């Protein structure tokens, strides 16, 4: 119970604030990195850091291998792929974001062109020439460390797609197709790429096949087209398939022999006899007595019902039994009956035996009749299909298939053969993929290596056989929604498919070009046009449905976005067609996909989130870890299993009771097996969950007391945490779940130390760490640049703050700087606020939230939002636009914030309508009016030929300028402002260079000093005589820079010193080269869109306080809108006079069933009061220094012995005070999902904090001073401010744009639109009888064009009468009617 949740409780931040955990189940399995899904997939695709010779055939390597070699049509040239390499990216991530570039590396592919000499007569070829050359194939986007891509300057995420796994699936129509409600079974073979193959029963119980959902054919047509035994025997004997004169298909006899066993009837003197098969006779009632054919004795009387046992008994007595002629009638022949002498066919395979046919065969003297074993367990489906199939040979079948696939084209045997080969048996056109082959082997019970990726004859036959078995009631259909049948396509695989398409387009062009150029003189790069491949990549990242603008509202939303699984997208489902089953939770989701986190609305269940411990295996199936259990004893061994592997397991819950040795203690254990819950004995359990939170996703695992919330509200809670806006001062939750640190670390919002070392320098914008190696020697310098007030995709503010001080020791993996929404290395989406559950004058009706003025005043929920505005100066036909301060007809007051270049200063406070960047655009020459002529004569030229197109701040935005960036085209002179920005940037780079060089130099000199100490000098250095023993005093007399010139007599030491010098000089040269490269990039000028000469980006920081209309929420789906800000003195207050911060409506709890919020309130109340007690002890300790023991014993009491001994006991005074200060606001606790604090723990904490265990207190009304009638639940609850801010939504319009057709005002804030006055509003005005108001609403205030003008004129003349005309929408209606051929005339009648 006293475990700490953070794995890194001893880490740098973990020691500063310790989270007490209520978990009873420890973490056995480390949680995988949360964004590994993305990173691992793309690394496997690029194999960037793998030597070209060692690359596995996956990803990019596999794409090139599958498309190359490319041969020309004449067979004289071949282009082969050797290998590829990715060079260094041109710009780093930061530069790409600033310049609007794509973070990508140039892809160089080494290609080999082989040219042959072909002998005209013999056709033999000899190699004439081989040319190898690296060819540039476009840029390949790289993934950042955080699993995102920078495309055109914005961060994007490629969402993984869930799709149906390739393989074979059996299903039925659930009785919906046919009116009788009988099940029609179907099988479908789905390849990774290529044609789909469907087998289905129709209502007449015949089996049909469809290729690519085309017209159906009898299945036997497909079987005829497959190779028969004659051809297979010829190939088996070593004949090349190409050399066979003709390929023989399967015959009717072969088809029937595959699907049916035979029953041979023999003629005896006593009549026809058959072998007695107990299976065939089981369960039937005999119509006549059974007589042994050999002895003639009766073995069973007529009317007997044969059971399995009696049938077996009879089988022991009689081998063959006599049957009447009636038993032969209606049976089907299994083989062709042929007269061996004459070759005459008496009966064909599959033919039905009728009375006449049987008599004819008897007269011909046939003594043995092989028939098909069709009985009540095996139906005649294939035989019946054979009977209705009009084809009987392979050629007919192929031509039939050709007609279905290419209707309207005349078939020839050759084209039909080629089409059929290409459909399922050609590697280039049909690919099951290794996954598909593995799935197919498992389902069909065949054993083909996973390199066989096309269909085989055996696969098709087995599929049809299993389909017929299903029809006969053997076996079960597949569950399409089982995660064993759905797989994940991550970034790497999606990218691989896209790149393959690009290369295939390129391949065609290469073939044609090889034919049209002189193959002897060209080089590989002359043949290649990489545009199609580059375009495919660009299109995928830029406009694919799965390439999404990253949700960067806060660190949790980033992590969740990268872990998202979508069933939509290319090759997936569509919202409209997805049924209920696909969206529903499935038993196999356990531990793989979160059952809670999914959007509300049309996408529910189609977009999911990976569970916390889930991983995706190499086949794309989601796996979850299980602990192994042997003989009822739980081991610490664990392994990851997919849904298919889990099918065999008996899995116990993570909280199954066990003793200290790990033995399960209950007599019966609750387990999951094949999707059901059962009770079994401990020795039958095979495995066990690793953690209670493995079932839910990251966002759901952040909700404390999730087990006490209704699922619908938990869904809202996990979704709303992703919308929490980063606050100026965030608090980590008092009541957390222990997942907070993992999310903060893996999200990339914080800065994590790459190597161990000592902090050397620090300021607000960077941290310099002197990295130390294994032996403690300096290994180099790590400079961490902090992101300061940068804009996220959602306009929230990204700002990082250092957590370390100079001299601090950090180890690899420590969090050294907090980012947005993190505090001390833990996720901090909101604030802990004191909250009371009670009604307050109707202000918290219907989920409204009442807040105290303190919250607004103290910036508790204040957030900073950064808006980006950009303006471009283009080269127009009339001349260049210019960015300038000299704008016509604008007063000095409006230009007060602009510098001499016309760009706003950083730090300026700006309001709506203020000019941010002055810009003028040339105006076309138009004839001048006399007034203009006069003005021009007086004021000179400038004013008239340009117009003001400055960038102004849009309405509703007020803020401070935090950053300005100026981009100039190459070759265009930079203005003063651009030069100033460039100088500042170069200074910053130079400072980094100097610091890094300084640290390297210090380390070098220290090691040099160690080498020199105690050795006699060898002379040749001014000021040190030969033979002088070198000591600190000797060195102190000389400047440090000169030490490197001192030489000593010991040759080994001299060699060491020379090596040191070389290493140091190389390191310094590398630092300088890096600096010069960056400066060169800065001064070079920017790549701007065509026609743009200059671009300016202005960033405005807007401070948003909490105000009425803003949306807030807790973590339990308890959301509401702020209704009123109440003065502090009017808020209800506690007995000690503390006013509460928030008042929530208690009626929001019972019907919503999210009781977790109440438990959180109680526990938060206890935490805060414990923190207060610790704060008092710290004060005493500071005053008189005597209270250390009391403080330690208090901490021991709170955290328990284990944590105390592990972490707290060996702290020094400073560390102890820092810890206690961090606990002053409350002792943070972790109550993990499904394994958290019990009610008894909460009561325990409350009593320890000296509070009433009911969690309720007497509150006093702040307005009357009277205590409320009964006690009120008060406590600390974690509240978030959501990204639905009233300032972004409020909007007003007087006049503005109108729609062209209807002439009605546009809608929406972005269009500066009006509010629709809808039909219900019209009814309201009608009900009031407000006729004139109604008339205005429907005419002059909306779409009566002439009326609008008249109103304007009347207002200008200061009159108040006007006339309403005909609304434009009425004219539109008339035009619509006229377009239908109805002539509508308006009659002008006076009233």
UniProtKB/Swiss-Prot annotation:
Reported function? DNA-dependent RNA polymerase catalyzes the transcription of DNA into RNA using the four ribonucleoside triphosphates as substrates.
Provide the protein name. Answer: DNA-directed RNA polymerase subunit beta
Cysteine pairs bridged by disulfides in the record: none
Entry keyword set: DNA-directed RNA polymerase, Nucleotidyltransferase, Transcription, Transferase
- Do you know which HAMAP family this protein is assigned to? RNApol_bact_RpoB (MF_01321)
Q: Please name the NCBIfam families in this protein's record.
A: PRK00405.1, rpoB
* Gene3D superfamilies (alphabetical): 2.40.50.100, 2.40.50.150, 3.90.1100.10, DNA-directed RNA polymerase, beta subunit, external 1 domain, DNA-directed RNA polymerase, subunit 2, domain 6, RNA polymerase alpha subunit dimerisation domain, RNA polymerase Rpb2, domain 2
Superkingdom of origin organism: Bacteria
* Enzyme Commission code: 2.7.7.6
